[in-house]
A protein has these predicted regions:
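Hydrophobic, helix-rich cores of sensory/ligand-binding and other regulatory modules
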Residues: 1-218
């Protein structure tokens, strides 16, 4: 963060890298409170995201918590390009139709083909990448569960422009989303292993234990 004093807007602010402008007649208390408000906002955001991961791992909730931070629509898809979650604003604005899932809960074909063509997309691409679509910057990063590709996160900067400081923030957020998706995959993998065990037990003609019966009924 850079705090400048003077009688005119500093040139660096025009670059779009900074989101806080303090006017020349602000006193020290106002400046201090403004800085604290910024830190409080990001601290509350981080705590809310981590609490969500620890409890429900609700990806949709994580996206809604993050809209005030990025001020742009966010989409999370799985390894087969099916939607896991997307920002609620996408359904409220017709100009965001391209980011809505189609009838198969997948990306619109036109946007998907553009993404694949313009970024040379590959599931092995671990570093974040940017693409330009209709003059707007789109941040994209793949998600992994260990070494396994499990999806992708995209933030389309169509409401406010992409700033230099957004890159590290997007990467940090993507790691938290990755933790949530990985947790859901771990739960799913555990259920699959349990069901396989129960199926083999039934094939052998062995009675199920009370715990196995309870698992099947839930």
């Amino acid at each position: 963060m850079v705090i400048c004093i003077g009688s005119s807007m500093p040139e660096i602010y025009r670059s779009g890298s900074y989101s806080c402008l303090i006017v020349e007649n602000s006193d020290l208390i106002t400046v201090n409170n403004t800085v604290l408000d910024i830190f409080d906002q990001f601290d509350a955001w981080d705590r809310a995201l981590r609490e969500t991961i620890e409890t429900t791992a609700d990806i949709q909730k994580m996206l809604e918590l993050s809209f005030p931070i990025f001020e742009n629509p966010i989409v999370v898809i799985d390894s087969k390009f099916h939607f896991l979650a997307y920002s609620a604003i996408i359904d409220r604005r017709d100009d965001m139709l391209a980011f809505r899932p189609d009838n198969n809960n997948m990306f619109q074909k036109e946007y998907l083909s553009l993404s694949l063509r313009d970024t040379n997309f590959t599931p092995k691409k671990r570093e974040p990448f940017l693409m330009i679509c209709n003059g707007n910057t789109h941040f994209s990063v793949n998600l992994y569960h260990g070494d396994r590709f499990i999806g992708n996160l995209k933030i389309a900067f169509v409401l406010r422009p992409f700033r230099a400081g957004d890159s590290i923030l997007c990467q940090y957020f993507s790691k938290l989303v990755e933790m949530a998706v990985s947790k859901l995959h771990s739960i799913s993998d555990g259920r699959e292993r349990k069901l396989t065990h129960i199926f083999r037990t039934l094939l052998l003609g062995t009675p199920l234990s009370n715990l196995d019966r309870q698992f099947v009924s839930t």
